[in-house]
Amino acid sequence: MIAVRQDKVGKRYALHKLAKFATKSPDCGYVNGLELDSRKILPGNAFVAIKGLRKNGLNYIEEAVARGASAVLAEPSPNNPISTKIPFIEIPNLKEQLGAIAATFYDHPSRNMHIVGVTGTNGKTTTTGLIGQFASITKRPSGVIGTLGSFPKNDLKFGMNNTTPDAITIQSTLADWRDL
């Protein structure tokens, strides 16, 4: 995703929201948002260090801290304890819980919306574009997330690197739209 989202430039989120996911309750601290990519960390973000297919997020903690991360979320690592100068929040099954964590962190933005999913082999971009245009014509606020990017109110705001964005990007985008 290529964007400066609202959560990264002005809002603050309490880490204690993540207590139900963590092995121990995080200290009372605040972060501006969640980020999976250490290269995209902005000061005040929490770095979510997930083990991927090719790379392990734990290897990028130092880079995230150097870029201004104010907390790290990661799987418990009992055989290889991690020491950081910032809060380190251990969350079992982090990758599997990421959607629920992001939804909780951003105050469940989809609860304030009607969500429609469009699937299939062909025609998804056209179909979602038509739905968005219809909503606009009928004066209903709408947004589309897809191949071309995310469009709140049919106005391109963010470019996407993937057709289906990660859970954090989806939840933070929905939170931005909720707060428009």
How would you label these PLM feature ranges?
Residues M1-A100:
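N-terminal leader/targeting and accessory segments in enzymes
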Residues D7-V9, A19, Q97-L180:
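Phosphate-binding loop of NTP-binding sites
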